[in-house]
Amino acid sequence: MASEQTLSIIKPDAVQNNYIGEIISRFEQAGLKIAAIKMTTLTKDQASKFYAIHKDRPFYNDLVNFMSSGPVVVMVLEGNQAIAKNRELMGATDPKKAEKGTLRADFAESMSRNAVHGSDSSETAEEEVLFFFKPDEITHR
C-alpha cells in the first residue's frame, strides 16, 4: 500500500482544553507519522480562505470566527491510507453521533466545537497541506 499524506488540525477548543498530546498520541498509535507540525493562530482572512468551500452555508461565519478565536495545531500526517485512517479516528462531525473512542466522542464539545479537522479526499488533502506548509517544511518519514 502506498503512503499518503493528509492534513489534520487540532481546533481551538481542543487546544484550550490541553488535548494536544492525547490527540497526537492517538494518531501515532494508529500508525500515522507526523511529517510536519506547527502551532498558529489563524487570522479571520486565513480561516475564511481555508473554509471557502462552506461560504454559502449558514454556519460559515461562526466557523470562521471559531477557527480564528485561538491557537490551532496544524499537522501533516503520513501513512498507509492516512486520509481514511484519520477520518476514522476523528469520528462523526457531531460528537453525539461519533463512535465511542473516536477523537470527537472523547474530546469535542459540540458539532461546531468538534476538536479536529481532517482532509476528506486526496485532492483536498493536497490543497490543504499546501495551504499551511511549503514543500520543504514537510519531512517524509
UniProtKB/Swiss-Prot annotation:
It comes from Protochlamydia amoebophila (strain UWE25). One of its GO terms (molecular function) is ATP binding. ATP binds at K11, F59, R87, T93, R104, N114. PANTHER family: NUCLEOSIDE DIPHOSPHATE KINASE. Its main location: cytoplasm. Keywords: ATP-binding, Cytoplasm, Kinase, Magnesium, Metal-binding, Nucleotide metabolism, Nucleotide-binding, Phosphoprotein, Transferase. Belongs to the NDK family. It catalyses: a 2'-deoxyribonucleoside 5'-diphosphate + ATP = a 2'-deoxyribonucleoside 5'-triphosphate + ADP; a ribonucleoside 5'-diphosphate + ATP = a ribonucleoside 5'-triphosphate + ADP. Homotetramer. InterPro entries: NDK-like_dom, NDK-like_dom_sf, Nucleoside_diP_kinase. It is an enzyme of class 2 (transferase). Major role in the synthesis of nucleoside triphosphates other than ATP. The ATP gamma phosphate is transferred to the NDP beta phosphate via a ping-pong mechanism, using a phosphorylated active-site intermediate. The keyword Coiled coil does not apply. This is Nucleoside diphosphate kinase 1. It is found in: Cytoplasm. It comes from the Bacteria. GO terms for biological process: CTP biosynthetic process; GTP biosynthetic process; UTP biosynthetic process. Gene3D superfamilies: Nucleoside diphosphate kinase-like domain.
